[in-house]
Amino acid sequence: SLITFLGLDEDQADFKDYKARKNGTFQYKDMKPYFDELDKLGGFKIVLSHFPENFEKVEENNYSQYDFDLQLSGHAHGGQFILPFIGPVYSPGQGLFPKYAKGSFGERPQLIVSRGLGNAEFPLRLFNHPEINVVYLEKDKFD
């Protein structure tokens, strides 16, 4: 079977848009034309997106509305700080108590968010170990 990758070149906020990005009001580039092209293709479709918060936004950049199987993202740094019994505290682009800081979400499409190896605004991680994700695709699961 065919596996198709869509790597999105999403705009990053520059310094003047930094506050808007932190507040979750930054306007990302419209990705609909890229998803329209992806819709024309068959097989298992993987979307590579830096920003997990675009998976289920209420705006036009709600990636989960499109026809694909898996989105791989990072950016959230696992919530930077994780408090026991509470969870992730802060994530760039999502603010306090982010929904998509780490882990797996949804069925189809499915989102996998890696905590990654780096840091965000704070050069410290608390109860939040760096990680590299390994994803196994099984042919009989998507034929």
How would you describe each model-predicted region?
Residues 1, 106-107, 137:
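Active-site beta-strand termini and strand-to-loop segments that position acidic
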Residues 1-45, 55, 61-62, 125:
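Binuclear metal-dependent hydrolase catalytic cores centered on His/Asp/Glu-rich metal-binding motifs
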Residues 3, 44-46, 69-70, 104:
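Short, Asp-centered acidic motifs that coordinate Mg2+ and/or phosphate
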Residues 9, 115, 136-138:
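Residues at the C-termini of beta-strands that transition into short coil/loop
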Residues 21-24, 130-135:
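A signal for specific C-terminal beta-sheet/loop modules enriched in small/flexible residues
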Residues 40, 140-143:
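Polar low-complexity intrinsically disordered regions
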Residues 52-133, 142:
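Conserved beta-sheet core of the metallophosphoesterase superfamily
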